[in-house]
Amino acid sequence: MAGLPGLRAADSLVVSGPVIELPKFEVVDSRLLPPPEAWRYAEIPGFEILSRISERETKRFMRDFLLLQTVIGEIMPMLLRGQTPVPTALVLCGGRGKGFDEFLPADRSIEQYGTNSLFFKTAERSAIVIDFALDEIQLGGEDRLEADPYRAFYAAYFRFLIRRQTIDKAPPWFEEGLVQLFAATEFDKKYISFAQIGDGFGASKIGDFNQMLHKRAIMPFGEMLAPDGPSRRTPFWAAQCYAFVHYCLYGWGLKNQAPFVRFVQRLGEEAPSETLFKECFKKSYKQFATELRGYIDFTAHKKVEFKAKKGHELPEPPPVPMRAAADHEVGRIKGEVLRLGGNSTAAHNTLIAPYVRGERDPRLLAALGLDEKQSGNDDRARKFLEAAASANVQRARAYLELARLRLDEVRTKARGAGGQLDADQMSRVLTPLFTARKLPPPMADVYGLIAETWSLSAAKPEAEHLAVVIEGVRMFPRDTALLMHATLLAAKRGFPVEAKALAERGVKVSKEAGDQDRFRMIAAAFERDVDPKPATPAEKPLETEPYILKQP
């Protein structure tokens, strides 16, 4: 049995309500089951906070975070748009032996080692881990930087916001430059300072690029602007990205703003190159690097300030209730953050410990089910996910993975005509999928699995059933896997007009030649069947796409 040493799987456990079998674990050696950990817990919209710093410092952090959100709403409201399907975990680690190191990723190349913050993100959820105990960050050699946990958090939080807005597609240098620019924002209820280098009184601030790069050579622009970033994303690379973005947006008469915007826009369709750079900035990499060197040494720039008039300052953030974290909350949040960092064994052990101690919170059961599914333990995953679904857990991926497991089960025992699925089997698979469809975030895989399930049905799907799959195509118009599922369903189950339209769309959006050829063959197969009659003066030509593909 993988997981905590000294545990063995036993017979199933029956819980109240519908008969749901759960794995049961027995502790062979009680010394191997760690005691519950003492953490503080707080919740604000979209975030769960797990803290091992003092109560006073935790309250200060939450006030600062809420005030930061208000500041962003005032000066950059677009950054706050977007859904957070699963609350983002904020883990605040305290003094020695209180946990930051245990969250370091298994693959140290994912995030640079030696910092006081970690950021993890998947399509479903994110996590930020902050070290409040570290005094200095070692940059290499004898170079050190004062560790500021608040600035580290601002950087991680803005990274989270930027990736949510750009769907993780921003060039690494662009994301890093914006992250460092935003993280340097200073604010209180009466004053907001943005894009300022230095403290305004002749002294430097932590993270200022001119201090970081004063004695450093400029990294070649081709390396800095690489589409996947440099091989090592050092603090000095981050500082140069910050310098480049700051110079373009706020330096020397704002002369580089328009070229910078053109460059970023064209990168949406073109790979970075010196030719593209010259077309936008009218300078070579080397020429611009020389300018940037001068800007680093003599930073003449425009800052942005907001000062509230008397009686119009930002409101005081409301107090956030805080309490001792429940065992299942510690296990679930820590376990999932460890899993995000690739620490799969530690994640499983952390998740299973509160379960062994008797915790049955639905969110813990869902997390355990997803963990077991990711580890390939489908039988245990199904039991945990069935129990979580029975308790009406609010997590879309739990229902998606449960539907996958149910489909795998019923397809080997098909009871319908022609070896297809009967109505009861279809309902068993589609029920969790339609629950997932109602929950955030929308997932292409949900619609793809709906299409796959209908393709195995003994009963022919109706137009309204195909319409649900088309709904997914509208939401994810460039997802070729979903588009292929929808096309094949329409082609095989008697919807030639929709099959042709979907296949033609697939030809347009597919990037792989093999996918394009497959879509092209399907479209050609239906060409004669759906070829419209020539329009007469009294007739309107047929739409190029059936109504079902049109946006409402």
Predicted regions and their residues:
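Juxtacatalytic substrate-recognition/specificity segment
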Residues: 10-27, 33-171, 186-189, 215, ...
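Beta/coil-rich, acidic/histidine-enriched accessory regions frequently appended to metallopeptidases
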Residues: 16, 268-414, 441-442, 498, ...
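Acidic/His/Gly-enriched intrinsically disordered linker/tail segments
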Residues: 35, 110-135, 148, 166-318
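Structural motif corresponding to the intra-repeat A-B loop/turn of tetratricopeptide repeats
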Residues: 341, 375, 409, 423, ...
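Canonical positions in the second alpha-helix
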Residues: 353-354, 387-388, 435-436, 471-472, ...
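Short coil/linker segments at helix-helix boundaries
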Residues: 404-435, 456
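TPR/TPR-like (Sel1-like) alpha-helical repeat modules
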Residues: 421-435, 491, 496-514
